[in-house]
């Protein structure tokens, strides 16, 4: 200045950049429906010999409520106090306008050393998803938190509990004139699931598995039954995830593919039913939740041909060729 005195200020703020690794997620799971995560930032004076005070209040926190705008799940902390990311653009904002930036140095010019820790992960229903709640009704254990030493990188490994669903298929085979089945149609089932998104709306249905009872297997079942023209089997779906990564229950439904069942009518219903008890129309049974394996089926499907063609007609005709004055 005019008096020849230079003033050096050490108030240049620092940006702490971190990265989140999500592993073992279901294929194609959207970033917008990932859980809310809160990070805590602690600091100490470099070279002071002091330990980080993880039992005390952090210098800053960051809550990410929308991961869709964060490329490679990279985020930043810019302010002391609460930092928030809650839009699809990944913008960091302070909780209040008067929050200062993160200092790089102390007032004495000593360098601060920062460390980042993940403090909590919560689902769309507000429950902790890392098993930190006080009871099974107050938390879900869906993620393992793995913090990588000496970096601002945290990994969450998804591991939903799994269960099974099974479908009972009853197929009535119509006989032809020779008292043998006209055909042995193959049977195919598709298993779909949905969950409640972070916005409170159901997700689009996702095809999870397909199970087939082949024509050869249907014929083998018929030959094992002897005189009966009604055959049945149970098809199972195992290792089905019970929860989506945001903590919402996966709700499954099974649908019969009627591509191979021309001329057959279909009835279905929830539960392990006998043929005479399957009275519901359609070809889909929903509202299914995976569970531990058991003998009873979760849904029953019945196929039968109401009317079998027993009378046939013969068509005859004559073909006339015009062959260019008998040249051929």
Please place each PLM-identified region on the residue numbering:
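Solvent-exposed loop/turn and edge beta-strand elements of beta-rich ligand-binding domains
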Residues: 1-328
């Amino acid at each position: 200045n005019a008096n020849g005195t230079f003033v050096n200020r050490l108030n240049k703020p620092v940006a702490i950049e971190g990265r989140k690794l999500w592993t073992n997620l279901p294929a194609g799971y959207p970033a917008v429906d990932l859980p809310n995560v809160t990070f805590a930032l602690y600091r100490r004076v470099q070279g002071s010999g002091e330990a980080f005070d993880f039992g005390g209040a952090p210098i800053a926190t960051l809550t990410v409520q929308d991961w869709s705008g964060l490329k490679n799940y990279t985020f930043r902390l810019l302010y002391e106090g609460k930092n928030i990311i809650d839009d699809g653009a990944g913008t960091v904002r302070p909780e209040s306008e008067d929050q200062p930036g993160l200092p790089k140095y102390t007032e004495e010019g000593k360098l601060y050393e920062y460390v980042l820790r993940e403090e909590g992960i919560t689902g769309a229903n507000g429950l902790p998803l890392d098993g930190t709640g006080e009871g099974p009704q107050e938390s879900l254990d869906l993620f393992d938190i793995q913090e990588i030493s000496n970096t601002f990188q945290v990994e969450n490994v998804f591991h939903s509990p799994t269960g099974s669903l099974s479908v009972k298929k009853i197929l009535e085979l119509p006989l032809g004139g020779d008292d043998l089945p006209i055909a042995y149609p193959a049977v195919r089932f598709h298993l779909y699931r949905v969950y409640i998104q972070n916005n409170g709306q159901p997700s689009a249905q996702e095809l999870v598995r397909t199970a087939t009872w082949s024509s050869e297997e249907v014929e083998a079942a018929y030959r094992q039954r002897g005189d009966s023209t009604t055959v049945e089997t149970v098809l199972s779906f195992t290792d089905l995830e019970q929860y989506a990564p945001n903590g919402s229950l996966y709700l499954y439904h099974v649908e019969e593919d009627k591509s191979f069942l021309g001329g057959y009518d279909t009835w279905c219903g929830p539960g392990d039913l006998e043929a005479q008890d399957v009275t519901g129309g359609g070809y889909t049974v929903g509202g299914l939740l995976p569970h531990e394996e058991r003998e009873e089926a979760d849904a029953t499907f019945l196929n039968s041909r109401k009317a079998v063609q027993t009378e046939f007609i013969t068509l005859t005709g004559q073909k006339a060729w015009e062959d260019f004055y008998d040249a051929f």
